[in-house]
């Protein structure tokens, strides 16, 4: 018998079975089309405040291990799947997905038609939703959802609270934590970088005081226009140091240079998004997770030029500065999870640092 339901703000109800924590949560309902990588999705801070629908029909079949987390504490509001595996099989598996969600206090629902839900989100756009007990009155929950205002301080919720010690030797890279994935740190350290992680609200003066050879701006959740402190910091360093922005970092650099952003109807979330480098003609398959994009037309009045576009919807996927060693991409070159087609961009960042140090 059904014991949990997903109720959307428009009154649509999906009845299913509970797994994970026995709690009720409200969030923005989104979908991800990746076939694997549910542990990385679960722990990606960019999903802060969201209820994530996984379109692949069977989730959890290789369990949860200690190595594949992208943050210390997952912050999604819920997980929606067609079928959840209760008996995972993998030599690294330490617990089931159900057990992991219970440990982190995250509710889940399975047994619903995730294809129907995804088609609805694709055609109507993402909406607020709530995972609740089957006993809850639908009209009451819908009324609560309509009154609910989703938080605007999402980057603050997931960013580091203080400056971290260095994690390596070599080129000094200040990593501005907007909701970073551990995979980004891993890529930098593997290239011999001395990585210093700083909070999102670190000032330009504080960043420059660390004497960085380069600055990287990470991924993160929410509306980029809410991150005003980060935008001001970027304005203060953009002509003084080599910069590489990823995802949220890409959007903030664009805003700092005078471009505009807008909310996508249903976002880009998955591990199979084709992106074209319009400078070289190269097409890469990328991992993506974002609900906002940079307005291409707004680049005309800035010192930025378009470098990458999405094949599927022709939206902006990358820019570079015309005067300074600054470039950004909307997708995730560190993958985790996803294809590694664009990991070479970390090498481009290192090359820019070296050229700027000469």
From Swiss-Prot:
Record-annotated Glutamine amidotransferase type-1 domain positions: 172-358
Family matches, as Pfam families: CPSase_sm_chain, GATase
Enzyme Commission identifier(s): 6.3.5.5
SMART domains tied to this protein: CPSase_sm_chain
GO cellular component terms attached to this protein's record: carbamoyl-phosphate synthase complex; cytoplasm
Pathway terms, separated by semicolons: Amino-acid biosynthesis; L-arginine biosynthesis; carbamoyl phosphate from bicarbonate: step 1/1; Pyrimidine metabolism; UMP biosynthesis via de novo pathway; (S)-dihydroorotate from bicarbonate: step 1/3
Key words, A-Z: Amino-acid biosynthesis, Arginine biosynthesis, ATP-binding, Glutamine amidotransferase, Ligase, Nucleotide-binding, Pyrimidine biosynthesis
InterPro entries in alphabetical order: Anth_synth/Amidotransfase, CarbamoylP_synth_ssu, CarbamoylP_synth_ssu_N, CarbP_synth_ssu_N_sf, Class_I_gatase-like, CPSase_GATase1, GATASE
Keyword NAD: no
Active site: 247, 332, 334
Top-level EC class: ligase
Biological role: Small subunit of the glutamine-dependent carbamoyl phosphate synthetase (CPSase). CPSase catalyzes the formation of carbamoyl phosphate from the ammonia moiety of glutamine, carbonate, and phosphate donated by ATP, constituting the first step of 2 biosynthetic pathways, one leading to arginine and/or urea and the other to pyrimidine nucleotides. The small subunit (glutamine amidotransferase) binds and cleaves glutamine to supply the large subunit with the substrate ammonia.
Family, as annotated: Belongs to the CarA family.
SUBUNIT field: Composed of two chains; the small (or glutamine) chain promotes the hydrolysis of glutamine to ammonia, which is used by the large (or ammonia) chain to synthesize carbamoyl phosphate. Tetramer of heterodimers (alpha,beta)4.
Name this protein carries in UniProt: Carbamoyl phosphate synthase small chain
Species, as recorded: Fusobacterium nucleatum subsp. nucleatum (strain ATCC 25586 / DSM 15643 / BCRC 10681 / CIP 101130 / JCM 8532 / KCTC 2640 / LMG 13131 / VPI 4355)
């Amino acid at each position: 018998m059904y014991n949990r339901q997903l109720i959307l703000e428009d009154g649509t109800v999906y009845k299913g079975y509970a797994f994970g924590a026995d709690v009720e949560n409200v969030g923005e309902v989104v979908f991800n089309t990746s076939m694997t990588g549910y542990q990385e999705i679960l722990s990606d801070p960019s999903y802060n405040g969201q209820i994530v629908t996984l379109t692949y029909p069977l989730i959890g079949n290789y369990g949860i291990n200690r190595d594949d987390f992208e943050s210390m504490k997952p912050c999604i509001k819920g997980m929606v799947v067609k079928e959840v595996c209760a008996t995972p099989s993998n030599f690294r598996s330490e617990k089931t997905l159900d057990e992991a969600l219970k440990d982190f206090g995250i509710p889940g629902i399975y047994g619903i038609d995730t294809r129907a839900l995804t088609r609805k989100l694709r055609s109507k756009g993402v909406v607020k939703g709530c995972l609740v007990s089957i006993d809850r009155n639908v009209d009451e929950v819908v009324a609560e959802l309509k009154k609910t205002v989703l938080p605007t301080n999402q980057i603050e919720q997931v960013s580091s609270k203080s400056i971290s010690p260095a994690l390596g030797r070599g080129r000094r890279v200040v990593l501005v934590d907007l909701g970073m994935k551990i995979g980004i740190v891993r890529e930098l350290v593997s290239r011999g970088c001395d990585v210093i992680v700083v909070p999102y609200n670190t000032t330009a003066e504080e960043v420059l005081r660390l004497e960085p050879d380069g600055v990287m701006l990470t991924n993160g959740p929410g509306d980029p226009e809410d991150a005003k402190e980060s935008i001001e910091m970027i304005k203060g360093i953009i002509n003084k140091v080599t910069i590489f922005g990823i995802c949220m970092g890409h959007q903030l650099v664009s805003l700092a240079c005078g471009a505009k952003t807008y909310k996508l109807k249903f976002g880009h979330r998955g591990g199979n998004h084709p992106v074209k480098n319009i400078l070289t003609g190269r097409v890469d398959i990328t991992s993506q997770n974002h609900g906002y994009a940079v307005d291409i037309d707004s680049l005309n009045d800035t010192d930025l030029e378009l470098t990458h576009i999405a094949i599927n919807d022709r939206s902006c996927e990358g820019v570079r500065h015309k005067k300074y060693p600054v470039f950004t991409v909307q997708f995730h070159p560190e993958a985790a999870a996803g294809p590694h087609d664009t990991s070479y961009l970390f090498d481009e960042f290192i090359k820019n640092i070296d050229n700027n140090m000469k």
